[in-house]
């Protein structure tokens, strides 16, 4: 659905050129919710604005639904953009227009007749749960309601793709959850492909099928969300994951425990999160596991749990128990003295 290939973008700055995007490529499948995460200055906002050519890349290919956007004439580009909705952190509502008019005015500009405009506005206000706010003004709405109006406006053009530029970053946690639930429902019920950018890992956790991690204008890590959570490879990715799942314990404690056994992080996903794998290990092997910390949550719609466990016993028995756990679809990682994770073979 969305194919970005070798995208490069450079801006002129007072201290010299700033390369915002460096040969970035990513692919978003039809019906997918794909997240791009990174800290400020990573290049993620520039990247998402290249998808509908609000930013023209210096080089590279931008395809949406197999159409190469970078070669389109202005008229054809406007038509193609009508199939790409976009929502922003700042809502971008007309302060002096009602909720109805904020959605209707852009529709009227496309040439829709009055009845079609009215029907479409009502349809999407119903979808976002604001049917009773038809005549309200933005100043009378909460932040979450303003974002719902912005979503309804984007959906009213009936796009195939929805771009979300930090759409929840200005909202409180409860409102963020409600907006994420709405995006999930839109994706499921309307079949709209969603590409979102964020600096919040909980957003990725709640809604994304796949995720790309950006740093200094580059995609440094990419994969299915569950795989990124289970086995982050690079420091930046680990920082994002640890912002939600931190099992750090003092290095000297790990050092002491490791003198008599081994400390390991166990990750459970989906059906394996409900299996008594650790209990089975104690019956099968001569080891004594001691749970140091743990947590359980969901990644999109599947359970995900982690335990930090000290395994006491002979190393051969511990190694066999690790293999048994991996055979039970439990991901096992050893923990070194400095708190960094290493994969256990």
Curated annotation (Swiss-Prot):
The record's section on InterPro entries has: AAA+_ATPase, ABC_transporter-like_ATP-bd, ABC_transporter-like_CS, ACT-like_dom_sf, MetN_ABC, MetN_ABC_transporter-like, NIL_domain, P-loop_NTPase
* A GO term for molecular function: ATP hydrolysis activity
One cellular component GO annotation, for this chain's record?
Answer: plasma membrane
Q: EC number(s) in its UniProt entry?
A: 7.4.2.11
SUPFAM superfamilies noted in UniProt: ACT-like, P-loop containing nucleoside triphosphate hydrolases
For this UniProt record, give its keywords in alphabetical order, as a comma-separated list: Amino-acid transport, ATP-binding, Cell membrane, Membrane, Nucleotide-binding, Translocase, Transport
Q: Where in the cell is it found?
A: Cell membrane
Task: List the catalytic activities from the record.
Answer: L-methionine(out) + ATP + H2O = L-methionine(in) + ADP + phosphate + H(+); D-methionine(out) + ATP + H2O = D-methionine(in) + ADP + phosphate + H(+)
The ABC transporter domain is annotated at: 2-241
The membrane topology noted for this protein in its Swiss-Prot or TrEMBL record is: Peripheral membrane protein
Membrane-crossing segments per the record: none
Residue sites binding ATP per the record: 38-45
Keyword ATP-binding listed? The answer is yes
Q: Which family does it belong to?
A: Belongs to the ABC transporter superfamily. Methionine importer (TC 3.A.1.24) family.
Q: What PANTHER family does the record tag this protein with?
A: AMINO ACID IMPORT ATP-BINDING PROTEIN (PTHR43166), METHIONINE IMPORT ATP-BINDING PROTEIN METN (PTHR43166:SF30)
Quaternary state and interactors = The complex is composed of two ATP-binding proteins (MetN), two transmembrane proteins (MetI) and a solute-binding protein (MetQ).
Biological role: Part of the ABC transporter complex MetNIQ involved in methionine import. Responsible for energy coupling to the transport system.
Q: What is this protein called?
A: Methionine import ATP-binding protein MetN 4
Organism expressing this protein natively: Oceanobacillus iheyensis (strain DSM 14371 / CIP 107618 / JCM 11309 / KCTC 3954 / HTE831)
Lineage, opening ranks: Bacteria, Bacillati, Bacillota, Bacilli, Bacillales
